[in-house]
Swiss-Prot record:
Name of the gene this protein is made from: selD
InterPro entries assigned to the protein according to its UniProt record, in alphabetical order: PurM-like_C_dom, PurM-like_C_sf, PurM-like_N, PurM-like_N_sf, SelD_I, SPS/SelD
Purpose of the protein: Synthesizes selenophosphate from selenide and ATP.
Cofactor detail note: Binds 1 Mg(2+) ion per monomer.
Enzyme nomenclature, EC number: 2.7.9.3
GO molecular function: ATP binding; magnesium ion binding; selenide, water dikinase activity
Protein name in UniProt: Selenide, water dikinase
Domain of life of the source: Bacteria
GO cellular component, one term: cytoplasm
Amino acid sequence: MSENSIRLTQYSHGAGCGCKISPKVLETILHSEQAKFVDPNLLVGNETRDDAAVYDLGNGTSVISTTDFFMPIVDNPFDFGRIAATNAISDIFAMGGKPIMAIAILGWPINKLSPEIAREVTEGGRYACRQAGIALAGGHSIDAPEPIFGLAVTGIVPTERVKKNSTAQAGCKLFLTKPLGIGVLTTAEKKSLLKPEHQGLATEVMCRMNIAGASFANIEGVKAMTDVTGFGLLGHLSEMCQGAGVQARVDYDAIPKLPGVEEYIKLGAVPGGTERNFASYGHLMGEMPREVRDLLCDPQTSGGLLLAVMPEAENEVKTTAAEFGIELTAIGELVPARGGRAMVEIR
């Protein structure tokens, strides 16, 4: 079977970050008395479902550690590897850090797909690592029923510049660095609904490196940061609000969207992860039309950064975004928490 004739997405039951275990089920899996062990040097663990773990070395520098892997979200092997690696490295940038090394995680159905195709996947991952300025230093592989690829990434960050998802403040403005709709467009492609003019759009967005995160972290007024991935904008914004004890007001019309996304939602191109996300986070949002809900719960793979920014830092953040060629979009604000109101209010 040639590399050009395969459709990798046919070999997996899920796609990209949409194959994540639902937040509700994950809560059950992670619940453990042993998890309450506290290391005073562990600045960020899994308490707030942040993007990565952070360990203070005690010398002004902290180590960031993360891993992320998934099944194919696109058919092209090289692009699959590149997207998976970009997505994994993003967690380091979302914490305000600089990646220094990565190792690969590969599961491959040896009896179904050739090793040459796996090599192309790995080369895509290596390409993304080079873009981030790091080496793909090794890895581990297993014979698996479905193709899986990703990275474990190590990074460093000045301890005082660590950006968490739980330190936002009322009064912060909310900004996104990438449009939503990745899950919808990739599902539309899988269902042969994607229009020719929309081919490749999701792949291009997923391959954009969130490298600006380290520069955003140097701005004092950036109070919190996370990347929007498998739990959708609603899930990751809800976690930001819960961690900080605030509520969000979001302007739906202001949210950047990939072309055609609302049309594809109406055609039923909604990934399975959308329903799982709504089941976990839907109770935190107010009433809204089904198509709005489906976009906010759309699982993003290698999505953009979500920033909570104090008003006085807005211009500096915009200037920094422009330096990286980012179309930064203001989508709402954070307000003091009040009982009886939805945690995420869509206007």
